[in-house]
Amino acid sequence: MCDKEFMWALKNGDLDEVKDYVAKGEDVNRTLEGGRKPLHYAADCGQLEILEFLLLKGADINAPDKHHITPLLSAVYEGHVSCVKLLLSKGADKTVKGPDGLTALEATDNQAIKALLQ
């Protein structure tokens, strides 16, 4: 399967395409080109429905990417409040520190995200 096409679907919110890849055997925990997992790409781009689907299919909510960034940190860094809320509700570890040594709470100035993390 082509990583670039799968990554495009993850980033652009093409849920039907993501479902098709998974139905054909795509591992939701596989490290893709670029050193990140599917959940990271969805979190980075604010793709809430895709996050929900990947988690339902067993994606590791706390898996770090090649930079030691978790999906929660990805969503926090990009300011995706709804994704942060979903990840926390599904058990994401908010104490993990990113490569800068900061937790998600310490890494954001977004007040809505801070409120979720406290």
Swiss-Prot record:
GO terms (BP aspect): catecholamine metabolic process; cellular response to mechanical stimulus; cerebellar granule cell differentiation; neuron differentiation; positive regulation of cardiac muscle hypertrophy; positive regulation of cell growth; positive regulation of macromolecule biosynthetic process; positive regulation of NF-kappaB transcription factor activity
Locations listed in the record: Cytoplasm; Nucleus; Cytoplasm, Perinuclear region
Keywords, ordered alphabetically: Acetylation, ANK repeat, Cytoplasm, Nucleus, Phosphoprotein, Repeat
Segments annotated as ANK repeats: 2-30, 34-66, 67-99
Modified residues (N-acetylcysteine): C2
Primary residence: cytoplasm
InterPro entries found in the cross-reference section: Ankyrin_rpt (IPR002110), Ankyrin_rpt-contain_sf (IPR036770)
Task performed by this protein: Plays a role in the regulation of the growth of actin filaments. Inhibits the activity of the F-actin-capping protein complex formed by the CAPZA1 and CAPZB heterodimer. Promotes dimerization of NF-kappa-B subunits and regulates NF-kappa-B transcription factor activity. Promotes growth of cardiomyocytes, but not cardiomyocyte proliferation. Promotes cardiac muscle hypertrophy.
Protein's recorded name: Myotrophin
Taxonomic lineage: Eukaryota, Metazoa, Chordata, Craniata, Vertebrata
Gene: Mtpn
